[in-house]
Amino acid sequence: MSSPHVPTALTIAGSDSGGGAGIQADLRTFAAFGVHGTSAITALTAQNTRGVDAIHTAPTAFLRAQIEAVLGDFRVGAAKLGMLATPAIAQAVAGVLATRPQLPVVLDPVLVATTGARLGTQALVAGLRRRLLPLATLVTPNIPEAEALLGHRIASRDAMPGAARALRDAGARAVLLKGGHLRGSEVSDLLLTADGEHWFHQRRRRGEFHGTGCSLSAAVAAGLALGRPLEDAVEAAIHFVQQAIVAGYRPGKGALLVLDHLAAAP
């Protein structure tokens, strides 16, 4: 029996044992958008709402096997890249994706956990910049991640356009620079494409939320898998994350809150 095409997205990211971020958040996001979710796990993390205790990375050959198994069977409409953990993993992912240049790729350069734990080295930063930025349809760094990729501080909202242009110059086709780490009662995110700048402003929410970056990049990938233009996918993703934050809850004993993805389903 044949069935109609189901929009499908792929997340290539780490597993969060606490369920708040990583592939767990990505797959819930895909489901909220009505997109079939597939995954390739780059690393297993032992973490919870208090912090990251340990990381076990996947062998690169097995990671490639996961990605190729998905791409060889499903009509994947977009891929989202999250925690890549090591330069070897970044290189392996880049090697597979370079053979599929038509596949939209959303790169979330996960380098620091919400708790402050570092998830990447300088060698990984260099690998992301050299190998994966040129493959990215969209890169979605927060301020610390953009600073790591560029090697300089981004001290204010006024500095965001220059930083976004530098990331585009490094190879990304579009940049969504998230300004949540800057001070102020309002959070400003900047989308820079070949057509120019588009700003998004939201009221800052109180609390330390876990998995916002993962969910945002996954939501953009879901929108692209549904065939939406990039700007529309980004706008819908930002709205989705804001609604999921409003419905967020604290499932553990730590301070981190997690997003309620299903409550925010479009």
PLM regions: where:
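Phosphate-handling active-site elements
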Residues: F33-T38, H198, G223-I238
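Short, small-residue alpha-helix embedded
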Residues: T29, E147-A148, G207-L230
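Nucleotide and nucleotide-moiety/phosphate-recognizing core
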Residues: G72, G77, P87-P104, R173, ...
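Acidic-glycine-rich active-site phosphate/pyrophosphate-binding loop
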Residues: M1-V6, G22, S185-W199
